[in-house]
Amino acid sequence: MAAKVASGTNKVFQNHDDVHISFEDQQRINRFAKHNARMDDFKAELETKRNELKSLEEALEEIELFDEDEDIPFLVGEVFLSHKLEKTQDMLKETKEQVLKEIAGVEAKAKVIKAEMDELKAHLYQRFGSNISLEAED
């Protein structure tokens, strides 16, 4: 690191254009970048799951209007199976509960990653100050 001593004093001024990056610092930067990419994946997955949840809730509302003895097609894998109203409602509720669990799981993973990212960000900003930018580019 380049340092300059002010004349007549013992103060040291550092030239911020010449910052030494240690191997450990590079590892932290790389880990932060990986976590940032994972967070983007989690955001996309959460959006997909929330849209799926919304569709399930709308389907539950719509089938309320059907007759009890009418067959209602329900998508299982790649095929539609027809069931009576009550059975279809039960299947939709089970699917909704599963999607809610999946959303909670993704949110929990994202929370852990976010905590580690915050820790890395604090360390890297302390070390490099304004010479590094770790903010998302939205």
Swiss-Prot record:
Belongs to the prefoldin subunit beta family. Gene3D superfamilies: 1.10.287.370. Binds specifically to cytosolic chaperonin (c-CPN) and transfers target proteins to it. Binds to nascent polypeptide chain and promotes folding in an environment in which there are many competing pathways for nonnative proteins. This is Probable prefoldin subunit 4. The keyword NAD does not apply. Keywords: Chaperone. Heterohexamer of two PFD-alpha type and four PFD-beta type subunits. GO terms for cellular component: cytoplasm; prefoldin complex. One of its GO terms (biological process) is protein folding. The keyword Glycoprotein does not apply. GO terms for molecular function: unfolded protein binding. CDD domains: Prefoldin_4.
